């Protein structure tokens, strides 16, 4: 009996980020594929025009945890949904990206939350 797509989607929907990461790694090993993003070539001419466009995706980088590391770990967990150990490892390994590919409003909100917790944050 085959498993329906809806059943698979429901199972994936209920997984944590860590479980999804392990699932992707298992797919990579089982089928010999890579989950890396495909690079898309930009326009051949008009490089200056591309630079003039307003940036739409931002990366929030935790530059330094600061003195109140516990509050920063809590803020990272709240923003990312990571578990305690993963959030602590991210904070201990600063500078590291906390959120990637988010819009300006989400980046500013994440920056404010982390700075309120005592961290030094960069938005790139």
UniProtKB/Swiss-Prot annotation:
rRNA processing found in the keyword field: no
Mind telling me which Pfam families this protein's record contains? Ribosomal_L12 (PF00542), Ribosomal_L12_N (PF16320)
Which UniProt keyword terms apply here? Ribonucleoprotein, Ribosomal protein
Query: Does the record bear Cell wall biogenesis/degradation in its keywords?
Result: no
Recorded GO cellular component terms are:
cytosolic large ribosomal subunit
Q: Which GO terms describe its biological process?
A: translation
List, in alphabetical order, the Gene Ontology terms for molecular function in this entry. mRNA binding; structural constituent of ribosome
Protein purpose: Forms part of the ribosomal stalk which helps the ribosome interact with GTP-bound translation factors. Is thus essential for accurate translation.
| Subunit field text | Homodimer. Part of the ribosomal stalk of the 50S ribosomal subunit. Forms a multimeric L10(L12)X complex, where L10 forms an elongated spine to which 2 to 4 L12 dimers bind in a sequential fashion. Binds GTP-bound translation factors.
> What family is reported?
Belongs to the bacterial ribosomal protein bL12 family.
| PANTHER family recorded | 39S RIBOSOMAL PROTEIN L12, LARGE RIBOSOMAL SUBUNIT PROTEIN BL12M
Name of the molecule in the record: Large ribosomal subunit protein bL12
Taxonomic lineage from the root = Bacteria, Pseudomonadati, Pseudomonadota, Betaproteobacteria, Burkholderiales
Q: Which gene encodes it?
A: rplL
């Amino acid at each position: 009996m085959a498993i329906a797509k809806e059943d698979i989607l429901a199972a994936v929907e209920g997984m944590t980020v860590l479980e999804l990461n392990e699932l992707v790694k298992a797919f990579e090993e089982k089928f010999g594929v890579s989950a890396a993003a495909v690079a898309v070539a930009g326009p051949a001419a008009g490089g200056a025009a591309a630079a003039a466009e307003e940036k739409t995706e931002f990366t929030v980088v935790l530059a330094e945890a600061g003195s109140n590391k516990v509050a920063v770990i809590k803020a990272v967990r709240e923003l990312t949904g990571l578990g305690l150990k993963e959030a602590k490892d991210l904070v201990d390994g600063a500078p590291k990206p906390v959120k990637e590919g988010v819009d300006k409003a989400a980046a500013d909100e994440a920056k404010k939350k982390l700075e309120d917790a005592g961290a030094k944050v960069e938005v790139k």
